Structures are given as structure tokens and as C-alpha cells.
């Protein structure tokens, strides 16, 4: 667990400094050449800095151990900050959407510079490296903040490729409206990406139940025990990445209290070995 928090912290810091570098160079060249797609890319980098900063802060809070007032730890902090990230992304995308539409209406052109192409290539390489690194960490630790950042880096590679296409089409083929269209596409992409993160974070914060397959597997495991007649009133409460399970097992009414509680204790230990389960609470109902 400690390694996961350290890895997420490192990924957050790399994202902050990498995106800050890209924001500065893209913002300068974008305003200098009046390229809406490059300005859009710079705004996207600004949102990426916020996302990486939220990753860093959220990871720090969620790594705090359990205490008297937070009995199950601080795992949901990651989802709270992921929610902030998504709202920021969607807000910036709406601003960018309006600017791009106005640019298409006004038929604004941009001033070509070879630096536009150079910065696009630098961005693609930088973001590709950040994506590969962060995606590997996400696969290893299954962290929503790492997942959000990895998807963000991947999207940036594709979006900057679109920016590069708009620059080439505008300068070499005289199709300047592509610049505004690409800005429009980038804004929509950012919004959709933010919406996906928002929904995932919202579901956890609203105590969405465990996935149906895992639930079915656990109930099947419980019912396989010869002394369990049925498994009812199954509840799964998320506490960050893991879940607290509460359910009732029906046992033979002739079974002693001692034996029924030993059975419940055995099942609790067995189920707690599952990677998604933090704690299991079983109520015994003699029938």
C-alpha cells in the first residue's frame, strides 16, 4: 500500500512539472501565432497541471492511516479530488468550446511558425512517455488517480496530433478553418474525459455496490459451505478502492451459538482475502 502511494505521488509530481513546461511553451507560441488549436492545447495543459496537483494532494490525504474519527481510513479522498479534476476539466472545455465557435464564425486565421510544429512534436513525445509510465503504475496498483492521469496523457497525444494536422492543413493547404474545428474537437474531448471521471468518482462517493460478478462469486463461495442454508441482505459499501461487506447467513436452528459464530468467523477471514475486500461483517440467522 505504501508503495502505491509513493508511486502515485511521483506520477503526480512528474505530471505537474511536465505539464507546466508544456503550458509555458504552448501558451507563448499559441498567442504569438494566434493559433486557436495551440491555445486550446495550452489550456488543456493548464487543466492537466490542476489534475496532477489534485492527484498529489488527494494521494497525500488518502495515504493517511485509520484514526478514531475515520475508522476505515481516508481512501475516498482520492475520489473527492478526482471529482474536482473532472469539474475543472469540464469547465475549461466549455470556455474553449465557446472560443472555438467564435473563431469559426469570425473566420480568424493564425500566423504560421515552424515552432508550432516543433512544440507539437515535443508535446507528443513528452505525453507519450508520461502515459507509458503512468499507465504501467495504474496497471500495477489499480489507482483511479493514476488511471485519470494516464488517460489524460493518452488523450493529449491524440489531441496534439490533431493540432499538428490543423497547423499543417492551414499553412500548407490554406484550409484555416481546420484550426477552429480542431479547437472545437479538443474542447469536446476534454468534456467527455472529464464527464467519465466525474461519473466514476460520483458512483463511489454515492456508495455504489460492488460489481455484480464479484458479488455473485462471494455469495456462491458462502453458499458452498455445507452449514450455510442461504445468504441474504447483502450490502457492499465502498471505502475508497476496497469494500466493507455486510450480509446475513441462514443456518440450521439446531446449530449451537458457538458453532454458528465460528462459521461466521471462518467465512469473514476467507472472504477478507479477496483483493477488493477490507472488512466483512456477517449476521447469523438461525432458521
What kind of feature is each model-predicted range?
Residues 2-18, 22-25, 32-33, 37-43, ...:
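Alpha-helical transmembrane segments and adjacent TM-loop junctions that form the membrane-embedded core
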